[in-house]
Amino acid sequence: MRTADDAFSDAVSGQALTLLVRALPAIKSAPQDLDARLEGQLGMWLSISGSSTGVGVGVSHAIGHTLGGSYGVPHGITSCVTLPSSLRWNASANLNRQREVSRLMGKPEALAADLVADLVKRLGLPGRLRDVGIRREDLQAIADHTMHDAPVRTNPRKIEHPSDIVEILELAW
């Protein structure tokens, strides 16, 4: 979701995504599969490497901070409900990067947002804000709070006003 290229983070994140997209459904269908679990663990470990290099994480993560800190939504679940809508909202600013995500997920012709939403659904996880108890009347307060979170400044598409975040939240609601 970031704006700048970083060859190291791109390579590591790409490998993480490839591993996780393969491992997570396998783990769901066969939790005892130690090879799938190892692949998932390696994918998870690689996925956090970008944060150690200072790569910005964007609005999806910023909204997640608000949902977790103020509404008790677990961090992993916040990504399930905010990432597809953030991808959709950001597509005008980073469509080529999103096409790479689609390629890494094995379907280069599909939209990254659709692939992520489908993965969340196949894993049986909540995919909308209302699925985790967020009320529509809370969207403005969530947006107002999220505007002050640092990852908003690293979003690929500039966020200038809380109404931009409300648009993303409406897509996720």
Task: Identify the residue ranges that each predicted region occupies.
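Alpha-helix N-cap/helix-start motif at coil-to-helix transitions, marked by capping-box chemistry
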Residues: 7-18, 38, 57, 77, ...
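C-terminal charged capping/lid subdomain of soluble metabolic enzymes
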Residues: 107-173
